[in-house]
Amino acid sequence: AVDSVYSEGPGEFEMYIIHQLEMIVRLMNVPAKRVMYTGTKVHPSAVIEFSDGRICHLIQRNDKNWSFKYTVINKENNAETIEIKSDYFKLFIDSLIEFFRTGEIKVSHDRTITVISIREALIKASIKPFEWVEIE
């Protein structure tokens, strides 16, 4: 079972953090409780605490050439780092077209709302670094 996640991703924080959050929410698989912004405008970073006490650390690189990278750690402190180098946006567009063709929803509404709620809390937290902001 996943105990902690260290996540890195490219792009501007407010716009692109959602892509890291999608994977983090899937990996942690429990509701997020609160967030703390620990970075600067130039070097965004944050901590997410989940309802079961587990945490995730994330950083956002303001560099679109950077790739997504996730280090997943289990309770025995074994870690595995996964770097995602796929053509993410092409795959996204393919899935979007498939959705319009079939109407099949690949991600639940609840998961989408969870991701957006964490993103909103992170944006609020970025105004007051090093203070916890509850997920609403």
Name each model-derived stretch:
Residues 2-67, 110-117:
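Rossmann-like dinucleotide-binding domain that binds NAD(P)(H)
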Residues 20-21, 89, 93, 119:
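A general structural signal for well-ordered alpha-helical segments in protein cores
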Residues 49, 80-83, 134-136:
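NAD(P)-dependent dehydrogenase/reductase Rossmann-like domain
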Residues 59, 73, 136:
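Residue-level detector of conserved, well-ordered beta-strand and adjacent loop positions
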Residues 64-104:
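Interdomain hinge/lid region at the active-site interface
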Residues 99-136:
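C-terminal helix-rich "cap/oligomerization" subdomain common to oxidoreductases
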